[in-house]
A protein has these predicted regions:
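Adenosine-nucleotide cofactor-binding segment
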Residues: 1-59
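Short beta->alpha linker loops
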Residues: 8-9, 29-30, 51-52, 76, ...
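C-terminal hydrophobic helical "lid"/dimerization subdomain
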Residues: 11, 58, 102, 106-153
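Short, hinge-like loop/turn segments at secondary-structure boundaries
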Residues: 21-26, 44, 87-90, 112-116, ...
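Conserved beta-strand scaffold positions in the cores of enzyme catalytic domains, especially
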Residues: 24-25, 95, 122, 126
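Glycine-rich phosphate-binding loop and adjacent beta-alpha segment
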Residues: 54-114, 152-153
Length: 153
């Protein structure tokens, strides 16, 4: 992968994506016009939907090229959700589900162990175990953190 675009509604995850090497970041809190304009000139081959929202899934379907792939990673709400099924059919999109934490866990451990993945770059804060309640509040605040690690004190 040489061209990676990350879209989010919060500035902190976008700044983090830039630090990790994203080619382009797009703040979609005010709408998706910029993302759609970029996709209109160069549709994406693959889109990973990680927000777990129907709007996120519809957006991913809308920005991939004909024959592109949309991978649903975010946990969608239960029940029926509106999906632009005609766009999936007309654009011949490959819509894939991904059950996180299934068989991938051992693969992830192996990638971390052999150094293929630098997990420390994902850590945005370390807090002592004695401050666990505050650390958990920080971890829930996407505007300030990506991953928070508790350390033994």
């Amino acid at each position: 992968m040489t061209d990676v675009t990350v879209a989010d509604i919060a500035p902190a995850p976008l700044a983090f994506a830039t630090r990790l090497g994203a080619s382009h970041v797009e703040n979609v809190s005010g709408g998706e016009e910029g993302l759609k304009a970029q996709a209109a000139s160069r549709p994406y081959d693959v889109a990973f939907e990680v927000s777990g929202t129907a709007a996120g899934l519809a957006s991913a379907i809308g920005i991939v090229r004909r024959g592109g792939v949309v991978v649903q990673i975010g946990n969608l709400p239960g029940g029926q959700i509106p999906t632009p099924s005609n766009a999936v059919m007309a654009k011949e999109i490959d819509l894939r589900g991904s059950f996180r934490f299934g068989f991938e866990f051992m693969n992830a451990v192996e990638l971390i162990a052999d150094g293929s993945v630098d997990v420390l770059s994902l850590v945005t804060a370390e807090r002592p175990l004695s401050t666990a309640p505050d650390a958990l509040r920080l971890a829930l605040d996407r505007s300030q953190s990506v991953k928070v690690v508790l350390t033994a004190n």
